[in-house]
Design a protein with these regions (language model features):
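Pocket-lining segment of extracytoplasmic ligand-binding domains
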Residues: 91, 167-260
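Short low-complexity, flexible loop/linker segments enriched in glycine and/or proline
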Residues: 101-103, 196-199, 320-322
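Short, glycine-/small- and polar/acidic-enriched structural segments
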Residues: 21-165, 172, 179-185, 201-209
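Short, low-complexity disordered leader/linker segments with a strong preference
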Residues: 1-33, 326-332
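Proline/Glycine/Serine-rich low-complexity intrinsically disordered segments
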Residues: 121-123, 223, 282
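Secondary-structure end/capping motifs
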Residues: 225-304
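Conserved C-terminal helix/tail region of periplasmic/extracytoplasmic solute-binding proteins
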Residues: 295-332
């Protein structure tokens, strides 16, 4: 009898994510036009949002993705109301809020996903001294973090170059235009597949734990469109749960929107994002990436004034979305 009960419980917990993903959320009243900003071209971590966009648009929504060349332009558009939501790392929204913007953290998209990579002859960070090191942009969270780390921890001064877009930095590395850079995990897997053994990851400890991304909303839009925002977040969570229940559902989306990624690494890349990056949390994750990022940049002296992270979060949207879907037991 005990074994039978255990088997029933096992089946319940395995099936729970799939059932949660099948919950129908009624379409909200109001303006269903949403522009979602991305800090660069579409990357692997964006693809569940793309999958959500395509599903909602087939149901009468008008969701579009806006790709920016710089992380600060993504958040600037959010602050101005040109876009309503943004998938962003932490520092750009925090800076904008300190300047008076009304922006709010809604939920986590993924944990830290960046790695520092270099030519094989560069053995550790000290070998980068005086070498060409490429970053995405001066204001990007990860770019700023790596510059501080190279200066303060490695005690070196590389020749910093700005090359927006991880795929562009990969090309520059392959063309011998730079010696080292930082990229998302998906970009590294792509490069290592194309040129195995030519490049490697430089150890940075826990530095890139702060490189996670999250969803942020324009405060004025949120105030007027609370139910639309709630249902949109619920639909994102449904997609996250679909991917956790069956990662194969994401493969055609990745193949379509990341055509340069070799087909044979799509499945392992998704698996790495789920297991290593802890991407797409089924219950929306938590605010630790916000808290940890603010602490890192406060301790390093980059943030000059105190930041109360609790004031940056609008918890009601995620809470209401979860009330519509229910929580996945044991998940983040």
């Amino acid at each position: 009898m005990a074994r039978f009960a255990f088997a029933i419980l096992t089946i319940f917990f395995i099936a729970a994510p799939a059932r949660a993903a099948d919950v129908e959320v009624p379409k909200p009243r109001g303006n269903l036009e949403i522009k979602l900003g991305h800090p660069s071209t579409i990357s692997l971590y964006d693809t569940p949002a793309i999958m959500t966009r395509e599903r909602l648009n087939s149901q009468g929504w008008n969701v579009s993705s806006v790709e920016f060349t710089r992380t600060d332009l993504n958040v600037q558009a959010l602050a101005q109301g040109t876009i309503q939501l943004a998938n962003s790392q932490i520092m750009d929204p925090v800076r904008a809020i300190q300047k008076g913007a009304k922006l709010f953290f809604l939920m986590e998209n993924n944990g830290g996903e960046f790695v520092m990579i270099a030519k094989n002859e560069i053995k550790d960070c000290k070998d980068i001294d005086g070498k060409k090191f490429a970053i995405h942009g001066e204001a990007a969270t990860t770019s700023l973090a790596i510059k501080l780390w190279l200066l303060n921890n490695c005690k070196i001064k590389p020749n910093i170059m700005v090359i927006p877009g991880g795929e562009n930095r990969i090309v520059a590395l392959q063309n011998n235009q730079i010696d080292a850079t930082l990229v998302q995990l998906g970009d590294w897997l792509n490069l290592d597949s194309q040129a195995p053994g030519r490049y490697h990851i430089i150890k940075t400890g826990n530095l890139f734990n702060i490189s996670g991304a999250s969803f942020w909303a324009n405060g004025e839009w949120l105030r007027k469109n609370e139910e639309v925002a709630t249902v949109y977040i619920a639909e994102l969570l449904k997609t996250f749960r679909m991917v956790h229940a069956n990662p194969k559902v994401l493969e055609p989306v990745v193949a379509k929107h990341l055509p340069d990624m070799p087909k044979h690494i799509i499945a392992p890349a998704i698996k790495a994002y789920l297991e290593v990056v802890r991407a797409w949390p089924q219950n929306g994750g938590d605010t630790s990436i916000l808290d940890d990022t603010v602490k890192f940049f406060t301790d390093s002296g980059e943030l000059k004034s105190a930041v109360n992270t609790k004031e940056l979060v609008e918890p009601k949207i995620l809470a209401n979305a979860l009330s519509k879907l229910g929580k996945v037991p044991g998940a983040r």
